[in-house]
């Protein structure tokens, strides 16, 4: 019959074999084809390393089965296995050894059957089919050996539909194991399961004992929407934290995860995404935060300050703010007080229009500073700016924006200083002090950007 052998490089070799061939014979055939000495070959099938003296039939390898070929590292390495009694065993292994192989070596040394062994490394229970390399276990690493309790216990898992599932478990079972048992019973993939006990979400690498889950305890099963995702949180110090979240997580949940990782109390955290401060009760989905999005974490200053906002009618509003408030936040506070929608507000300080995503601190707005509030005419519009390289930039503007303002927006997006920009529309170069309305530039008009030569005139 034919079988296939797949190497780590992705190459697949076809071999003519018989069920009665031994693993030695197969390695000899591989040597004939590929020139790899048998003692450097390890063959894996169904997660198990195949032993030389056994036959293909012993492993139920049938026609068109695929074996995986792993090359042995020249020379192995030593690792240590520490038992709960404090005894340390030394094993000769290779990175490509599977966890099954390691358990077999422990059985050879200590007489403990593999099915009573649990191996833990870096807080994770190791799965039989995986290799030491998969877990980044290197020379002189120490694994911990925990014996399975003979005789488990029953626990209950209650779903949102009200159905209760009974599981046979042991205190030393990890949450991963429990999820696998739920999958066996209910067909729900582990990555769609969330298990809750005593109000806490249970983490995969931990054991039932870690959470003090005892016989006849009840866990609650919540289904994850569409599996989880990773997002990043960048702090002002430049550090980036990675979080495992779901679209349905609330901003409160995210702050709690940041507290778990970094120790920062939620009430001192402000999260910013796309220039907006995120509100506690909302979900990531509400803000269209998707996998691998980056949030910005700003710490609240303890104790805020007062600023003033003066309107064109001469009325002055007093606001309680913090330096880390974004301009969006300030506009929201003005809306609360005056009922003016944020998209109709323009805030001016020191002659500059303030941009939504920036903070008061960015503009050096301090206590008792006065901002000026101008109402926008009929909301804004989009225009396009085309560069000589053919790139098109989209800008949010208003008819009353000056050409200076437009150049500043281009600088924010592209980093080109205004004094190196020339804007052309309808064959005319646009002058800084004029407005878009002066040139009859309307929504979805296209301007052309030409760079000034340095030292030009």
Swiss-Prot record:
Q: Supply the name of the protein.
A: Polyubiquitin 10
What is the protein's species of origin? Arabidopsis thaliana (Mouse-ear cress)
What region holds the Ubiquitin-like domain? Answer: 1-76, 77-152, 153-228, 229-304, 305-380, 381-456
Q: Which domain of life is it from?
A: Eukaryota
Query: Is the keyword Amino-acid biosynthesis in the record?
Result: no
Q: What else is known?
A: Ubiquitin is encoded by 16 different genes. Ubiquitin is generally synthesized as a polyubiquitin precursor with tandem head to tail repeats. Often, there is one to three additional amino acids after the last repeat, removed in the mature protein. Alternatively, ubiquitin extension protein is synthesized as a single copy of ubiquitin fused to a ribosomal protein (either eL40 or eS31) or to a ubiquitin-related protein (either RUB1 or RUB2). Following translation, extension protein is cleaved from ubiquitin.
What GO terms are given for molecular function?
A: mRNA binding
| Function summary | Ubiquitin exists either covalently attached to another protein, or free (unanchored). When covalently bound, it is conjugated to target proteins via an isopeptide bond either as a monomer (monoubiquitin), a polymer linked via different Lys residues of the ubiquitin (polyubiquitin chains) or a linear polymer linked via the initiator Met of the ubiquitin (linear polyubiquitin chains).
Could you say which protein family the record assigns here?
A: Belongs to the ubiquitin family.
Disulfides per UniProt = none
- Entry GO CC: cytosol; nucleus
Recorded hits in Gene3D superfamilies, A to Z, give: Phosphatidylinositol 3-kinase Catalytic Subunit, Chain A, domain 1
Indicate where this protein resides in the cell: Cytoplasm; Nucleus
Arranged from A to Z, the UniProt key words for this protein are:
Cytoplasm, Isopeptide bond, Nucleus, Repeat, Ubl conjugation pathway
Question: What biological-process terms (Gene Ontology) are attached?
Answer: response to salicylic acid
Gene for this protein?
UBQ10
Propeptide, residue positions: 457
A Pfam family the protein falls into: ubiquitin
Q: Where is this cross-link: Glycyl lysine isopeptide (Gly-Lys) (interchain with K-? in acceptor proteins)?
A: 76
